[in-house]
Amino acid sequence: TGDRDGGDSPGYGVWRSTDGGISWHARNSGMGNRTVYEVLMDPTNSNILIASTNGSRIYRSTDAGASWTYTSTASSCKDIAFHPTDSNIIYASGTSVNRSTNNGVSFTQINSGTPTGVQRIALAVSPDEPNWVYLIAGDGSGLDGIYRSTNSGANFSTRTTTPNVLGYDTTGGTGSQAWYDLVIAADPTDANVIYTGGVNLWKSVDGGATMTCTSYWVSPQGGIDVVHADQHALEFSLHTNAIYNGNDGGVYTSSDNGVNWDDLSSGLAIAQIYKIGVSQTVSDLAINGYQDNGTSVSRGTSFITEIGGDGMECAIDPTDANYMYGALYYGDIRRSTNNGASFSAINGNISEEGGWVTPYKLDPNNANRMVAGFDNIWINNNSSILTHFLKISNKTFVRNIHD
């Protein structure tokens, strides 16, 4: 339980269901209410479980989770994996790479050829080459490298350091969110085929020596399919040639080796709403801002996404519903004058960056007046002029504005 990616959800240890997920019971004796990043079951003994948790800890259970023993400290460990044919060998990675050769009783850090000074390392194995281990490492500036071991993790060598497969562009570019979105997977039938995920998805057919972008987070581009940004999970089906991807937008799958991707998220009630703006003049009209899934206009039972990215503060003019307001992160406020058909930025003259969720309010008695909170309080007394904000405070760093 908990959220391993953003660290926003508290954890309550490991829970277990014995009736196919209908009911759940805590199994965290000896572990407590920790955020659990990953739980693995020994493929040869279902009573043995290995869990990575917050606090850089690895726990082991020999009684199907009834009790847990703290076995090792592994720096910011998030990923763990069993050797495909030898369950005595377990790999763990976070900001370092660690290995157990005694079924998780203890772990030793591997320093030969492994990355150092990075924000995060993810790992992958494949039964096609059971002694191979892949690593992908990155920091805030981009990809550190893709690495491979061919001797069960005893040492690693660099496969590539370019392009920046953690960047925002289909060519790599700059930047990275390795602390947040980082994943790697190796094909179970061909260990030379690997997929990596950061903002976009990338693929290699030569063991990571060369990488090709296989999805783009904005829109289809040059034969590259669109997949929602921020990749967190990649899993291969053992029964078909499908690969499944979990990201900030939901679940996607590809059945043609990553060329095309289908969104499977329909029906999943997973949207996290930051803010809602409700019309005072039109029944069932609202505008909603979602974490990771943009801003949508709701008319009764239909929801139409109008602004991408992360949707934040929302509002509708109290006297004229043609005027709607949405926002992206850090204070990028947008306005529609045509009932949500299109939006334009309105805060071009504000010289400050706002908070992640930047607050703003419309005056209920004068819909032409908007107050917005950045480092200072800014006011626009004539919303028909898009860049007519005036600063009216001195370094207050506003987080909330109340009517």
Residue ranges of model-derived segments:
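Beta-propeller blade termini and top-face loops
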Residues: 1-403
